[in-house]
């Protein structure tokens, strides 16, 4: 499993057949280490034997090993069956075993130097097809499981555990790390391999079902990466009307955990621990959605689009509901905040029945808890509120702000920030946990995004406008997130989108909503039963009796067996929670201590092999991060040569700069319309000294004020020294001049003043050798964080430069050019 041991990930697989045996040859990312897995099926095909024939082989020994296998076999020859990128598992129905392989993949996200892949194509390999018992039941099962569309919304990673949150990864030492099988959809398929090679083996690759998306906020050239991960629970999974409410073991229908990760994309790797200062800083926030945890259902009919809701079982002790909330306490801690969005007033009671019963359940459970541990319940009829003049987003904003303050969010430490933990979770639901729930989760995500950006030093206050590029980008991500979850559970895309609740584009959103309503009704009427059968087969929730397949019986048998063995004990109805789960002080203490233990962990030399493959040629057009959906707006064309040689960041795609950089956090409606306006006088001006057909713009005018200042001769001289291949070629069309809004200028200053260590100059003589080295590295590699262009900064830089030379004379040649250019830069600024 990923991230559980020190074994190198296996990223490519070749399946060979030799008589009755199968050999899987795997290799690491650099194709330097190989491992071999042997699979043998019994004569009766009811059992299978798996062993690791060779653990570590180099290429030369691999060839010798394969030749030896062929020589030892009298009449056999190794036959290449297929190639794959992941082993998803082994399973059987009524006859022999099938091997499940991922044959095509695509990178969709990069987290901490770990690639996350989407499954594009899969293949079933029948072991021993010559003895195949092609019964009608076998054919039906195989046909059903192929209907589970693995070319959609299934994800895996070789080296990153997608089943766990980032906070868990940072606060649990790697030897104690455990995969959450609740979100591993191929868990039953991996069982034969797990039993043979162990859970820590890189042969076992967990598969999650849900949604993964990644985008980039360009903040004056600095990439801020936003990642959205949705994990769907495999327990009580299925179609909308066939999976409602809660199961007896506390798992609910349509249960999804959504994690919003925001980090500085300037560096790739994770910090060593959450409490150790590191670059970059990682932040995350987790939300939860799931069906109302009561025993309820809907009598589905092909005639009625909204079947009546009925409560199947009134438990006076709410035992299943108690198990559900105790599990939430165990995963996330306290407080557990319930945001219930079902309707409260209806002509014919449907959703309101669940509202009353849910309130009674929480009141009953809370009476046994301390005030600080109680479930915090918020009921709000979002459907009724959307019909009023006041936008529902305003009310949700207030709720979201209070929720985030109570739960906090996870953030790793840096030099000036100790780091924080998320303690507690918000559980959002409506009747389907689709449309209203997704809109509410977006508003909470928007509120958290502002807080995360503030922790990263991008914003000075946790406020974001809906019309800004950053929020629009986040809204698109949550829209895709909601569509994926709705398609998996309801059979259609979102019926009511965020635009519906914000009352934007009413005509287009209304027509779209009607179309999706029809699609959902059709899916629920004619397709859901087939989908439910396929999902049950895929998850292994069936039992074979001779040649008959019975669904659902396997789980009940396992539950009965646990009761018999004493592994499952009925809880006291008054003490329904686990005490250690609600001990917040102990949880935080343990998390901090476990995080400290990670400080001694050293990343292996092959840490980046999956992201930056050393034995293959790759281009920027093929790498994910430069091609992410982004708010990127570019600086003016005339600034490229200067920025490439200056200390300022550059957002450059290699094809030229298209437009001035705009602040992604300013509302678009407030942007000055004449920003790109070209005056008639400017059109008649002569070409500048560089023979470009556009007017040069001063760097200082762009950054600090709106008055044009001349570029220093030294800089112009340096521009002519740039190789022709690095210069931006002149264009036939003249580039317009522009004015930078003061808001952009102020935010730019704030952004690059954050975590500025140039203030250490006053106490340089008192600094330790370690801090001096840090400052020298800063001056050498990160001079883009200089607060202002002043003469004292040059003196400070020279002081550190001279001190560094005295400690390491070899640095003189490396720094002299930078100091000279820096001096010319300041001289030019003073002269203007």
Swiss-Prot record:
Annotated Gene Ontology MF terms? phosphatidylinositol-3,5-bisphosphate 5-phosphatase activity
Where does it sit, as one GO cellular component term?
A: intracellular membrane-bounded organelle
What EC number(s) has UniProt assigned to this enzyme?
A: 3.1.3.-
Main location (coarse class): cytoplasm
Would the keyword Hydrolase be found if you checked this record's keyword annotation?
Answer: yes
| A GO BP entry | phosphatidylinositol dephosphorylation
Describe the location of the SAC domain by residue ranges: 145-491
Cofactor(s) annotated in UniProt: Mg(2+)
Q: Which domain of life is it from?
A: Eukaryota
- What are the TM regions of this chain, as residue ranges? none
Q: How does it sit in the membrane?
A: Peripheral membrane protein
Annotated catalysed reactions: a 1,2-diacyl-sn-glycero-3-phospho-(1D-myo-inositol-3,5-bisphosphate) + H2O = a 1,2-diacyl-sn-glycero-3-phospho-(1D-myo-inositol-3-phosphate) + phosphate
Give the protein's biological function. Answer: The PI(3,5)P2 regulatory complex regulates both the synthesis and turnover of phosphatidylinositol 3,5-bisphosphate (PtdIns(3,5)P2).
What PANTHER family does its record include? Answer: POLYPHOSPHOINOSITIDE PHOSPHATASE
> What is the designated name of this protein?
Polyphosphoinositide phosphatase
- Source organism per entry reads Schizosaccharomyces pombe (strain 972 / ATCC 24843) (Fission yeast)
